[in-house]
Amino acid sequence: MLRIGQDMSVHRGEWRVHASAVDDIRVIEDSLAWLCGDGVSISTQKEKSTLGAPMYTISSSMTGKQSMFSLTRLERVSIEEILLSGLESRIDEHKFLHLRIDLAALSMGKGELSLNKDTMVAKGRFKLEVYPGQSAYEVARSIFEGLV
């Protein structure tokens, strides 16, 4: 398993995008494929929104190694922002790390963190590999420090 930092890693990860019928689904699928790397399948499901309009959920599920590769696609400035802007607030009680990547930037091959709640995003969720005696925050910090 690819390790970054002081032998820190993730168990698995996923990226998910919610899109409307007017969005270019193929561009979103290609963007997620770039973000995840080779060997990760991208699935697209057509659904109806709560108001009945057609919508799509485009998602990927990754192994630990694939997840770590995906994190290397983040722009350096985004990694630094994650480290400076409260990494703890991105980790939930189940030791999942949550990220939001700007979809417009992603479609241009850039893994930029989204800080704007009104933009379309790819939502990332990564299960941190935390063992007894470790804190989820320290594991996540070590991963991102290893990426800088």
Regions found by a protein language model. Give the residues of each.
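Short glycine-/aliphatic-rich beta-strand segments at the starts of folded cytosolic domains
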Residues: 13-18, 93-100, 124-128
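Mid-chain, well-packed structural core segment of small domains
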Residues: 74-109
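Short, charge-patterned binding micro-sites
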Residues: 42-66
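Acidic, Ser/Thr- and Gly-enriched intrinsically disordered low-complexity segments
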Residues: 35, 55, 65-80
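Beta-strand elements of well-folded, non-transmembrane domains
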Residues: 17-21, 36, 62-66, 103-107, ...
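Long, hydrophobic N-terminal alpha-helical segment
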Residues: 1-43
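Glycine-rich, aromatic-bearing surface loops/beta-hairpins
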Residues: 101-148
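Short amphipathic alpha-helices in soluble, non-transmembrane regions
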Residues: 28-31, 70-78, 141-144
